Amino acid sequence: MKKPALVILAAGMGSRYGGLKQMDPMDSMGHAIIDYSIYDAKRAGFGKVVFVIKKAIEKDFKETVGARVPEGMEVCYAYQEVDALPEGYNVPEGRVKPWGTAHAVLCAKPFINEPFAVINADDYYGVDGYKVMADFLTSHEEKDGKAPFAMVGYHLGNTVTENGYVSRGVCEVDDNHQLLSITERTHIEKREDHAEFTEDDGATWASLPFDTLVSMNFFGFQPMIMDELEKGFPAFLNQAIKENPLKGEYFIPSVASDLLHDGKASLEVLVSKDQWYGVTYPEDKQSVIDALAALRENGTYKLSLIHISEPTRPISIS
């Protein structure tokens, strides 16, 4: 069986954080979170990385993140632009926001002919997540006419921030770790001993326990999902252009839920023992720096994650 591929979603505008957080250094050697992700994926058995980026950051991205990909991994670049639409569709006037995670994955279709995982560029998922995902993708095949998908799940309390709201896919799982549904909650805030979400700009709030299982967009798919994404995109556009032309997004969890409902796929929730870390807001950065420093100290990572021909000059981080 082919080694699985890793599709990294790096085209987001970083509207809440500001700047290109995909390239923001998190240690004195200049590594960003994305470097740790690629390193973990390679040692777990992934053989290819597909970066989904915007043309506007291509040069900087290739000279930094792209240049640091470990030897032995195939590297591809796909481009998510707001005007990457099916024939007959035009960008709504005033639209600058990308069309969402499912559209980003669809942009990688020309480079995918093997099982693959999808991650966010600016999320740290932990070593174990890549191991369990690689094991799943290399050991599961279609059964009873259903394509085997997977997701690494995390407890909500381990994924919220003190510094603002987050967006999470809230999961319903059966006793066999099979996903029943994902509901996207785009505005979740942390409280003292739980979280709350709103769908009406704060007019009303509903409670979510910290042990609620959520998706952090770490999915594993078979190549067939690309055709499903392509078929579903026009229907999404028809609705979004009518109801929310400037901010409507095509989400991976929504597509996955539809395929589960239609009996075309099953989705197993994989258990990872590792903590998730991310930088949604600038104030989150120091906690990520501290966590990665602790992982280097305990031997999880060596100082340099990449093979380089010349020494890397340590840099200051702030």
Predicted segment positions?
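Single conserved hydrophobic/aromatic residue that forms the stacking wall/gate
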Residues: 306-318
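Short beta-strand-to-loop acidic/aromatic patch adjacent to the donor-nucleotide binding site
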Residues: 114-124
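N-terminal glycine-rich phosphate-binding loop and ensuing alpha1 helix
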Residues: 2-66, 70, 75, 80
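Hydrophobic packing residues within well-ordered alpha-helices of enzyme cores
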Residues: 61-65, 133, 288, 317-318
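Conserved alpha/beta core of the MobA/IspD/sugar-nucleotide pyrophosphorylase nucleotidyltransferase superfamily
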Residues: 173-175, 182-305
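Conserved core of the sugar-phosphate nucleotidyltransferase
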Residues: 127-216
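Short, surface-exposed amphipathic charged segments that create phosphate/polyanion-binding patches used
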Residues: 87-98, 164-169, 283-287
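Short phosphate-binding loop-to-helix
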Residues: 69-114
